[in-house]
Amino acid sequence: MTKDFIVKDIALAEFGRKELDIAETEMPGLMALRAEYGDSKPLAGARIVGSLHMTIQTAVLIETLVALGADVRWASCNIFSTQDHAAAAIAAGGTPVFAIKGQSLEEHWDYLDRSFMFEDGPNLILDDGGDATLYVLLGARAEAGEEIIPVPTSEEEEAIKAQIKKRMAASPGWFTKVRDQIKGVSEETTTGVHRLYDLVKQGQLPFPAINVNDSVTKSKFDNKYGCKESLVDGIRRATDTMMAGKVAVVMGYGDVGKGSAASLRGAGARVKVTEVDPICALQAAMDGFEVVLLEDVVGSADIFITTTGNKDVIRIEHMRAMKDMAIVGNIGHFDNEIQVAALKNHKWTNIKEQVDMIEMPNGNRLILLSEGRLLNLGNATGHPSFVMSASFTNQVLAQIELWTRADAYDNEVYILPKHLDEKVARLHLDRIGVKLTPLDPEQAAYIGVKPEGPFKPEHYRY
């Protein structure tokens, strides 16, 4: 029988299983869902394509989906984020996975294509950044005669276009068939959600989508508290630099930016923030951060971190103006926040995996982390298990919702209801010793809620 996985070394499975066992103790939400739904198997019949960082925490998510009855095939959504022992553990357990840390862009899209290869085709997508959804929809448009990506503007676009052509040649009509049998997608990140809302505006979303990112127990925890721990971890592992006393610039003060600024401040750095949004800028200022123009500090700061989800935030002219040995990294989803492509003709020296020194024309050098991709996953191991449990519990609930109640949804983008958001939070309280104060019936009536919740209206902003 031909093996149905691609991992770096299947012998790493035992190591991965040991770390999985530890992670499970830190992921109470997922373990609670296994206990609640393990017997009823609400995902029986679901064939889920997963495109999300192949980490130890994701391995616990995958095994939860399988425990609830799903068939799963998995690829990583980032070329540097895979933890090879996690991928090996999942492959050894019988779930097809296609992910290697440091895979090429061509391999990235080939592996994603392989994750779709169920015998009867997939019927659900669990996405992070929207690559799996994009792949199917671009391919279906190409099959309809549209010229997709007529002039590729990046290596990434060249790779996806080539993979779509390859699949069309091998399996004519495949993309359209897959698109039409997908019951829905649950999306993990801000970037992927933005893509989904764009599809809705254009009338091109062919199935329902659940925006997991904007569940409170995802965006206000994973994005903020996860980055608060993982950003500095990534910088330290990559550079061994002491951050205390250094000047760090965080570009963007959304949830990820807030966590990143707090991370650097906690390490003793003097943190400055850049922002385009007046509300976020005011928040940063009132949190005690100096809000500046990048151009005014680019020559004096030591560390630059992008968190925006936008493109061309750090441009080539900024990097040429930086001091010698400035550290540049990104914790947004894609690598285009930093104009890495504009550096290709400069002298690169690889220091170690995902750490490069680049010499500028004036002789100054900069340290680029993970080639501008997610440094907390490329240079470290990403967010801790506990905070990822909250995010992934939302993902499992979203997959159950899409599979068991697909007919209740139109081809729009939805957010999980408040009672499920509160359920996710509640499942994590015992692990950290939190005790809730109960409302008596009179108190509940006074503020217009049920004693058991939900406690806030849908429009409440935490």
From Swiss-Prot:
Its main location: cytoplasm. It is found in: Cytoplasm. The keyword Hydrolase applies. Binds 1 NAD(+) per subunit. NAD(+) binds at residues 189-191, 223, 252-257, 275, 310, 331-333, 376. The keyword Cytoplasm applies. Substrate binds at residues 55, 128, 188, 218, 222. It comes from the Bacteria. Pathway: Amino-acid biosynthesis; L-homocysteine biosynthesis; L-homocysteine from S-adenosyl-L-homocysteine: step 1/1. Its EC number is 3.13.2.1. Its cofactor is NAD(+). GO terms for cellular component: cytosol. Pfam families: AdoHcyase, AdoHcyase_NAD. Keywords: Cytoplasm, Hydrolase, NAD, One-carbon metabolism. May play a key role in the regulation of the intracellular concentration of adenosylhomocysteine. PANTHER family: ADENOSYLHOMOCYSTEINASE (PTHR23420:SF0). Belongs to the adenosylhomocysteinase family. This is Adenosylhomocysteinase. It comes from Roseobacter denitrificans (strain ATCC 33942 / OCh 114) (Erythrobacter sp. (strain OCh 114)). The gene is ahcY.
